[in-house]
Amino acid sequence: MPKASEIKKNQAVEYEGRVYFVKDIERSVPQGRAGGSLYRMRMYDVVTNQKLDETFKDSDMLNLADLVRREATFSYADGDEYVFMDTEDFTQYMLNRSAIEDELLFITEDTQGVMVILVSENPVAIDLPPTVELTIEETDPSIKGGSATARTKPARLTTGLVVQVPEHISTGDRIRVNVEERKFLSRA
C-alpha cells in the first residue's frame, strides 16, 4: 500500500469502499505545523463519474486499484461521446467529453500513442504521449529573418489550442507540441 505522497496523477485508488481515478494532485506545506505535506486530490468515481476533492497527509496509506492501459486511436465523436478504438483487438471505448476535456486539445484522428485507461474494464480517461504533432490553423504571417530572433507570436492549432511559436512559423505548418507544458517544441 503506497503512501498518499507516492500517488501520481492518472492512477486509480480505492477509498471508502469505492474506486476513484486521480485526475489532479496539489501539494501544500502548511506553515507553523510540525506535520508533513498535505496532498489535495481531485478524484472521480469510476462508476458514477462523481467528483470528489479529498485532502490526505503524506503518511496516509491508500490502496491502488487495478488499472489497465490499452493503446488506442481516436475514431470519431458522437455528440458528447468520444470513441477510441483499441489498436490490437479493435474494441471501441466511449469516453464522455467532460472526462477528457483537457486532453481533447491535443487529439486528432492521426494522433499516435494515445492510451485508454481502464478500471474494472470501464474506460475512465486517456493518457497522451509526451509530444504530439498538430497543424497550425491560424497565425500572423511569417517574417523573413524571423528565425534569427527569439520573438514569438500566438498560433491557433486545428484542435483549438493556442501556443506561442517563433516568428518564422506560418499557417499550415505542422509542429510538435509538448503536451504537459503546452509549448512549441519544433517543426514536425
Swiss-Prot record:
Gene3D superfamilies: 2.30.30.30, Nucleic acid-binding proteins. One of its GO terms (biological process) is peptide biosynthetic process. One of its GO terms (molecular function) is translation elongation factor activity. One of its GO terms (cellular component) is cytoplasm. It comes from the Bacteria. SMART domains: EFP, Elong-fact-P_C. Belongs to the elongation factor P family. HAMAP family: EFP. This is Elongation factor P-like protein. It comes from Marinobacter nauticus (strain ATCC 700491 / DSM 11845 / VT8) (Marinobacter aquaeolei). The lineage of its organism: Bacteria, Pseudomonadati, Pseudomonadota, Gammaproteobacteria, Pseudomonadales.
